[in-house]
């Protein structure tokens, strides 16, 4: 009966990179599966570009293949998203985030709305770079004074393209007046400060998303 229907689930916006540098397959898999169990999930990328998955391996290749066949695998255009329609924001680890999301005016607008309303935000690994776009007119960062984690310089320097990275999250966060912390390279490390959850790397995806779910549950 209609009167016995479960209440509608809250909406969550999952923002991923559309750049060639791609999206971590393992981080996206965990973000998508955990979040879709609790939310009505909408995936969005800049320009609605198809995601290029990186770090595909034997454990996730089948899932990625199946995901691509689903209708909801086609991302919405980030530029057309109204942040007011969503209760939570989730950004998986995306090496491509440094290329497109970190300078996205559309994402900045959404993040500023989420910040002003204290709505739950979760960013993981390279996805933390996406938060860097959210600067005010006076160039101050909306997350100034927050405690944040993300890829440490020790983790980044191992990658061949380190010298050409457009942004070092650790440096940006410290320069912007926020507090950066990191554990050992590849260690699981999650920071929760007010309504913002950040995970150091792709390995931190599951506990980071679980903290997002906890935040959303505590707001009901």
Swiss-Prot record:
Alphabetized UniProt keyword annotations: Endosome, Glycoprotein, Secreted, Signal
GO MF annotation terms: glyoxalase III activity
Glycosylation sites: 57, 201
Xref: InterPro entries: Class_I_gatase-like, Prot/Nucl_acid_deglycase
Keyword Lipid metabolism: no
A cellular-component GO term for this protein: cytoplasm
Subcellular localization, as worded in the UniProt entry: Secreted; Early endosome
Signal peptide annotation: 1-35
One GO process term, biological-process aspect: methylglyoxal catabolic process to D-lactate via S-lactoyl-glutathione
Keyword Secreted: yes
Alphabetical list of Gene3D superfamilies matching this protein: 3.40.50.880
Family that this chain belongs to: Belongs to the peptidase C56 family.
Function according to Swiss-Prot or TrEMBL: Component of the FERRY complex (Five-subunit Endosomal Rab5 and RNA/ribosome intermediary). The FERRY complex directly interacts with mRNAs and RAB5A, and functions as a RAB5A effector involved in the localization and the distribution of specific mRNAs most likely by mediating their endosomal transport. The complex recruits mRNAs and ribosomes to early endosomes through direct mRNA-interaction.
Subunit architecture: Homotetramer. Component of the FERRY complex composed of five subunits, TBCK, PPP1R21, FERRY3, CRYZL1 and GATD1 with a ratio of 1:2:1:2:4, respectively.
Protein name per UniProt: Glutamine amidotransferase-like class 1 domain-containing protein 1
Organism: Bos taurus
């Amino acid at each position: 009966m209609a009167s016995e229907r479960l209440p509608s689930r809250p909406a969550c916006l999952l923002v991923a990179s559309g750049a060639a540098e791609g999206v971590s397959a393992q981080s996206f898999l965990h973000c998508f599966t955990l979040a879709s169990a609790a939310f009505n999930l909408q995936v969005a990328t800049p320009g609605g570009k198809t995601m290029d998955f990186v770090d595909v391996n034997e454990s996730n290749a089948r899932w990625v293949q199946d995901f691509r066949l689903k209708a909801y695998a086609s991302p919405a255009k980030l530029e057309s998203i109204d942040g007011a329609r969503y209760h939570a924001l989730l950004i998986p680890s995306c090496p491509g985030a440094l290329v497109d999301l970190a300078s996205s005016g559309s994402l900045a607008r959404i993040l500023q709305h989420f910040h002003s309303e204290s709505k739950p935000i979760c960013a993981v690994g390279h996805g933390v770079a996406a938060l860097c776009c959210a600067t005010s007119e006076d160039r101050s960062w909306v997350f100034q004074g927050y405690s944040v984690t993300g890829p440490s310089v020790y983790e980044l320097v191992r990658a061949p393209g380190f010298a050409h990275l457009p942004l070092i999250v650790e440096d940006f966060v410290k320069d912007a007046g926020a507090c950066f912390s990191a554990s050992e390279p590849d260690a699981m490390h999650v920071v929760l400060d007010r309504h913002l959850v950040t995970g150091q790397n792709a390995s931190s995806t599951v506990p980071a998303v679980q903290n997002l779910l906890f935040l959303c549950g505590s707001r009901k």
